[in-house]
């Protein structure tokens, strides 16, 4: 059963859309259940000034995307990187076990958007400093994250 917050973010998602001139874009997906999320960020003075998402998936996928963008908006890049999968689920009042992969995808899409921002701005040293090299490697190979262990679709 979903919490009232999940229903609210599903029925009234915040920050839906695309930023055409995004400073960073992160896309992740789960081939098991078909969820696909893209998060776009606009950064000014090391702070996420604007953030949007496009998600194709279930109610939990849309709600977690909405919540992750709400949590990240206005935060510094470093603060946004601290937004965890569990924090997204907790902010929504919890998720059923079989939907936890959605919070994983939302947090990972945000992290990928930040890695993309660093890459586009020649800050590869920052990616290494923050231990995000594996994320960059997956992005460069075009790999999607698979959180199938959480998905019972």
From Swiss-Prot:
Function in brief: A scaffold on which IscS assembles Fe-S clusters. Subsequently gives the nascent cluster to other proteins. Binds 1 2Fe-2S cluster per subunit in a crystal formed under reducing conditions; this subunit provides 3 ligands while IscS2 provides the other ligand. It is likely that Fe-S cluster coordination is flexible as the role of this complex is to build and then hand off Fe-S clusters.
Binding site for [2Fe-2S] cluster: 33, 58, 101-102
Single Gene Ontology MF annotation: iron ion binding
UniProt record, GO biological process: iron-sulfur cluster assembly
CDD domains, sorted: IscU_like (cd06664)
Family stated for the protein in its record: Belongs to the NifU family.
Gene, per the UniProt record: iscU2
A Pfam family annotated for this UniProt entry: NifU_N
Lineage of source species: Archaea, Methanobacteriati, Methanobacteriota, Archaeoglobi, Archaeoglobales
The protein's name in its UniProt record: Iron-sulfur cluster assembly scaffold protein IscU 2
PANTHER family associated with the record: IRON-SULFUR CLUSTER ASSEMBLY ENZYME NIFU HOMOLOG
SUPFAM superfamilies: SufE/NifU
Matches recorded under InterPro entries: NIF_FeS_clus_asmbl_NifU-like (IPR017787), NIF_FeS_clus_asmbl_NifU_N (IPR002871)
């Amino acid at each position: 059963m979903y919490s009232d917050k999940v229903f609210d973010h599903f029925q009234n998602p915040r920050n839906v859309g695309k930023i055409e001139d995004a400073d960073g874009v992160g896309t992740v997906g789960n081939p098991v259940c078909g969820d696909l999320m893209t998060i776009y960020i606009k950064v000014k003075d090391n702070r996420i000034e604007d953030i949007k998402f496009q998600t194709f998936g279930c109610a939990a996928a849309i709600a977690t995307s909405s919540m992750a963008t709400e949590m990240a908006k206005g935060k510094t890049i470093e603060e946004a990187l601290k937004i965890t999968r569990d924090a997204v689920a907790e902010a929504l009042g919890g998720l059923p076990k079989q939907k936890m992969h959605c919070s994983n995808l939302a947090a990972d899409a945000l992290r990928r958007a930040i890695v993309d921002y660093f890459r586009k701005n020649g800050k590869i040293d920052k990616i290494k400093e923050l231990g995000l090299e594996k994320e960059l490697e997956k992005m460069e190979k075009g790999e999607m994250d698979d959180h199938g262990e959480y998905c019972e679709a």
